[in-house]
């Protein structure tokens, strides 16, 4: 009788499967991005309300995507996409996870150098925050960079980060995309300068891991030129070029789309929001495409 009743209940309430919309377009495995890999918060910061601590929230940004069409590009990247900032406050860029995928057949020659840039800094060696090198035969790759420094909310809203992509040895016709990159950042938002006793602790990177923060050349295809020298040369060349006209997608300008950052005043919840967005890197300019079908809200990150 009990088994029969169980079968009847199953027939009345059919089992449904829920899937994330458009999830197949994302290269980044969101479940693998853990805040604990980048920062350690004190017990008071975990348990007390945000009004009683300097740290207001720890957040994972939305996904920003770059499609590379040229061998040398310097494109703006929104590392705080979807992060709610505190007015007149600060945000610490604790960590960055980058995932790339080569859109090439197997066993292709060549490779790429990727460099994160703070465009506020005039000296090229001070503007480079980290670099990574890999070959085209490695179809998919992931690496982490730990900038671990803070900027004001006012500076963050101006979009101060860029990514320099240097592809070498890949023989492909112009107008096609050899490489796709996705970026997700881990940020700490706070109102006042965190005291030394409360400051977040960045975990060390194990030797032999995927992170690379040096200028060392690890692949034969990479020319023996430091990324800082490449950035200085790239900037000097582009200063001589006339600025491109603004480009629009679906009636929205690229600049307006980039500045869509929200504020919060004392939000005590730790929120995680992830969404895909596409930026097409074309020389120095790029086009941003908003795709609402890939957006969703994730659950709060437990500590």
UniProtKB/Swiss-Prot annotation:
**Mostly located where?**
host cell
Which cellular component terms (GO) are annotated to the entry?
A: host cell cytoplasm; host cell plasmodesma; host cytoskeleton
Keyword annotations of the record: Host cell junction, Host cytoplasm, Host cytoskeleton, RNA-binding, Transport, Viral movement protein
Q: Which InterPro entries match?
A: TMV_movement, Viral_movement
Keyword Transcription (UniProt): no
User: Which Gene Ontology molecular-function terms are recorded?
Assistant: RNA binding
GO BP, sorted A to Z = transport of virus in host, cell to cell
Q: What is this protein called?
A: Movement protein
> What family is this protein classified in?
Belongs to the tobamovirus movement protein family.
Write out the function statement from the record.
Transports viral genome to neighboring plant cells directly through plasmosdesmata, without any budding. The movement protein allows efficient cell to cell propagation, by bypassing the host cell wall barrier. Forms a ribonucleoprotein complex with viral RNA. Binds microtubules and modulates microtubule stability. Can bind double-stranded DNA.
Please name one Pfam family that this protein belongs to: MP
Report the locations given in the UniProt record.
Host cytoplasm, Host cytoskeleton; Host cell junction, Host plasmodesma
Q: Which gene encodes it?
A: MP
């Amino acid at each position: 009788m009990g088994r029969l009743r169980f079968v009847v209940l199953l027939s009345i309430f059919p089992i449904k499967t829920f899937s994330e919309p458009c999830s197949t377009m994302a290269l980044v495995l969101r479940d693998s991005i853990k805040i604990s890999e980048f920062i350690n918060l004190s017990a008071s910061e975990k348990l007390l309300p945000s009004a009683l601590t300097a740290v207001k929230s720890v957040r994972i940004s939305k996904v920003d995507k770059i499609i590379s069409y040229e061998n040398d590009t310097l494109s703006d990247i929104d590392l705080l996409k979807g992060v709610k900032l505190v007015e007149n406050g600060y945000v610490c860029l604790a960590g960055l996870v980058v995932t790339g995928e080569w859109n090439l057949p197997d066993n292709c020659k060549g490779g790429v150098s990727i460099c994160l840039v703070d465009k506020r800094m005039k000296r090229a060696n001070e503007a480079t925050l980290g670099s990574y090198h890999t070959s085209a035969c490695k179809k998919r790759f992931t690496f982490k960079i730990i900038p671990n420094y803070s900027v004001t909310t006012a500076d963050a809203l101006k979009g101060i980060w860029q990514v320099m992509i240097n592809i070498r040895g890949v023989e492909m016709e112009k107008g096609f995309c050899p490489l796709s990159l996705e970026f997700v950042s881990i940020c700490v938002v706070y109102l006042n300068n965190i005291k030394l006793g409360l400051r977040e602790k960045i975990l060390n990177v194990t030797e032999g891991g995927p992170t690379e923060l040096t200028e060392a050349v690890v692949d034969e295809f990479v020319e023996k030129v430091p990324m800082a020298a490449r950035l200085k040369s790239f900037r000097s060349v582009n200063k001589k070029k006339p600025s491109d006209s603004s480009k629009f997608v679906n009636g929205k300008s690229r600049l307006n789309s980039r500045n869509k950052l929200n504020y919060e005043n004392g939000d005590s919840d730790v929120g995680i929001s992830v969404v895909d967005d596409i930026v097409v890197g074309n020389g120095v300019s790029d086009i941003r495409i908003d795709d609402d079908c890939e957006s969703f809200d994730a659950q709060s990150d437990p500590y």
